[in-house]
């Protein structure tokens, strides 16, 4: 059948979780790492904050829901066949949690 992963990440900066363009770009990058076939993308910005992105895939789906006020993001990935949802989760996690600025 396939593999289903749920990922919840906490303590993510508000600005990273309330930017619909950044969330969508991150999710697209994530599915591209496994050469998954995107069928449709839907992104919605909630008022006053929060973003949901849904990506329909030929191999199944990816969804991302953010709660910036709580610093939380939930990502749901299901892939059929030999595609690896773990690498999709890894890219999503890395892009959403790395600091935007670093001082050395």
Regions flagged by a language model, labelled:
Residues 94-100:
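Conserved small/polar residues in nucleotide/adenosyl-binding loops
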Residues 61-81:
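Mid-chain, well-packed structural core segment of small domains
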Residues 37, 41-55:
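Compact, glycine-rich, soluble single-domain proteins
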Residues 4-6, 24, 32:
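N-terminal intrinsically disordered, cationic/polar leader segments
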Residues 14-19, 83-87:
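Short, conserved charged micro-motifs
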Residues 1-18:
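Terminal, regulation- and interaction-focused segments at domain boundaries
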């Amino acid at each position: 059948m396939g593999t289903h992963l749920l990922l919840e990440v906490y303590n993510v900066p508000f600005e990273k979780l309330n930017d619909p363009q950044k969330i969508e770009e991150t999710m697209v990058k994530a599915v591209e790492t496994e050469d998954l076939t995107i069928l449709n993308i839907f992104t919605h910005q909630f008022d006053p904050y929060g973003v949901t992105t849904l990506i329909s895939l030929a191999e199944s789906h990816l969804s991302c829901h953010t709660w910036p006020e709580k610093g939380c993001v939930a990502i749901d990935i299901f892939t059929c066949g030999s595609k690896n949802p773990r690498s999709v989760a890894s890219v999503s996690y890395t892009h959403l949690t790395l600091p935007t600025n670093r001082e050395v």
